[in-house]
Amino acid sequence: VIEALLAPGAIRIADIGAAFLGEAPPYQSLLDNGLGHVFAFEPDARQVDTLRARLGAKGTVIAEAVGDGARHTLHVCNYGWSSLLEPDPAALAFFNSFAALGRVETTLPVTTRRLDDIAELPPVDFLKMDVQGAELMVLQNGRRKLGTCVVVQLETSFVTLYKGQPPFGAVDLEMRAQGFIPHRFMDIKRWSIAPALIGGDPRVAGNQLLESDIVYVRDLIHGTLNDDQLRKLAAIAHFACRSPDLAARCLIELGKRGVLEDSAVLSYLTAQGLKR
């Protein structure tokens, strides 16, 4: 049902901080089903060739840092920890094993590009972002490109690990100001507090909240989405967010508008074990 709603490659995905860390990105099923094209931004030169090989024709790799358009210092750390912000030694020392992971190996001067200024990037439908503390900077400088975006998935920190890093609350306020509401946590990461080890293993999580991948969606409660936005939100909800109830809401609305046959809506609901 959902695949028939969209032309091949219709969903425009932006992945900011696209380094491959051993896990498939949340939009992988959209690519596998021919529904999306990803613009992958990654300033770490160690990752660029791998990204190009993995994405092939389904992606465009842009080896640049996204930010506020100003010149910054890229702090190159272990994979997954590199950031435009400097790691905070006090925060790292609070958690077991983080001091080594957040050790800065080298620094590089980089000139960032504002999302709104990137001509080769079309308006974004689905933004995935993992930029180690620079999320708010990117969002504030990408309001035009995100004007019709329907889903944003980003990593946000409950405890900040970088100097000057905005906490979860500041990012949440910006997302709401741009017309999004929280939809779900894809995961919530906890970690053990140093120096005590649980079972002697630093990888065993304690109770301290650390960070989470959170999904925001365009506000369906107070806002009106056009047909194209509803189609894309249904596809992203189903294939990337594992949210059949959200996809169903979009399909039912498309049915009310005469865009989708009632039988197609019923077919999806039945397949997902849902009832009206």
Where are each of the predicted segments found?
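Phosphate/nucleotide-binding beta-alpha loop and adjacent structural elements of enzyme active sites
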Residues: 1-276
